[in-house]
From Swiss-Prot:
Stated family: Belongs to the KdsA family.
Gene name in the database record: kdsA
The keyword Cytoplasm is annotated on this UniProt entry: yes
One GO BP: keto-3-deoxy-D-manno-octulosonic acid biosynthetic process
EC numbers for this chain: 2.5.1.55
This protein's UniProt keywords: Cytoplasm, Lipopolysaccharide biosynthesis, Transferase
Cell division recorded as keyword: no
Top EC class of this enzyme: transferase
Pathway(s) served: Carbohydrate biosynthesis; 3-deoxy-D-manno-octulosonate biosynthesis; 3-deoxy-D-manno-octulosonate from D-ribulose 5-phosphate: step 2/3; Bacterial outer membrane biogenesis; lipopolysaccharide biosynthesis
UniProt-annotated location(s): Cytoplasm
Molecular function GO terms recorded: 3-deoxy-8-phosphooctulonate synthase activity
InterPro entries from the UniProt entry: Aldolase_TIM (IPR013785), DAHP1/KDSA (IPR006218), KDO8P_synthase (IPR006269)
GO cellular component labels: cytoplasm
Protein name: 2-dehydro-3-deoxyphosphooctonate aldolase
């Protein structure tokens, strides 16, 4: 098995390369907040020497309640993304939910994300593939790691092999997620880059009646465990005031802790990738 390298400008995304941070905020709450959060991430990652891609959503189409905040929408969201890219010279990642969104979004962002709940929607997969953009596939909470090969095949047959696989936890009974560390290693055997969404994996789906709960206090422990696997990247969301975030605040890392948090993740990644591989199958 060889590790596939995805080139994003000067950034190399691969399981045996230094990890790439995919980070930002859950949903675009306002232009000013997005700019402020992007600036913090840009400054911290530049200081620590971590390759970085800014993440946010323009629409949260799968909220638990019809009354929950969804975002500014595609048109306004893309304007904010363009300003972030121009101001901070950052590559961007965002998710799409409908086939018609794929082409216009891919004109602005560098990586388009297939949401976990939509990962088997063939029309959406094909529309995403045809953009030629790099694709981040969120592993559905209800699929086994080895079933990701079917989604990969769909993208391949639609003409796109620039694929990243993202672990974000698996259903464990009702209102709970667990992370299968061996499952991430199994996905790595595909050769495609594997990243770990360490904040969404903290969710308790439906845990707050009309929205998801979370376990923010365990954000460091879970991320440390994932980084010990030697992954292509880490996916996190942070907020300056998580308790008042408009989406997934219970899972969000407090923004003021970002630098110390990433220092630890980089130290683990550097250490693990300095080791010679050991083949215990023989």
């Amino acid at each position: 098995m060889s590790n596939k390298i995805i080139n994003l400008g000067s950034i190399e995304i691969a399981n045996d390369k230094p990890f790439v941070l995919f980070g930002g905020m859950n949903v675009l709450e306002s232009r000013d907040l997005a700019m402020s959060i992007a600036e913090t991430y840009a400054e911290v990652t530049q200081k620590l020497g971590i390759p970085y891609v800014f993440k946010a959503s323009f629409d949260k189409a799968n909220r638990s309640s019809v009354n929950s905040y969804r975002g500014p929408g595609m048109e306004e969201g893309l304007k904010i993304f363009e300003e972030i890219k121009k101001t901070f010279n950052l590559p961007l990642i965002t998710d799409v939910h409908e086939p018609y969104q794929c082409a216009p979004v891919a004109e602005v962002v560098d990586i388009i994300q297939l949401p976990a709940f939509l990962a088997r929607q063939t029309d959406l997969v094909v529309a995403m593939a045809k953009t030629g953009a790099i694709i981040n596939v969120k592993k559905p909470q209800f699929l086994a790691p080895h079933e990701m090969r079917h989604i990969i095949t769909k993208f391949n047959e639609a003409g796109n092999d620039e694929i990243i696989l993202c672990e974000r936890g698996s259903c464990f009974g009702y209102n709970n997620l667990v992370v299968d560390m061996l499952g991430m290693d199994e996905m790595k055997q595909s050769g495609y880059p594997v990243i770990f969404d360490a904040t969404h994996a903290l969710q308790r789906p439906g845990g707050r009646a009309d929205s998801a709960g979370g376990r923010r206090a365990q954000a460091t422990e879970l991320a440390r465990s994932g980084m010990a696997l030697g992954l292509a990247g880490l996916f996190i969301e942070a907020h300056p005031d998580p308790d008042n975030a408009k989406c997934d605040g219970p899972c969000a890392l407090p923004l003021h802790q970002l630098e110390n948090y990433l220092k630890q993740m980089k130290a683990i990644d550097d250490l693990v990738k300095s080791f010679d591989p050991i083949d215990t199958s023989k």
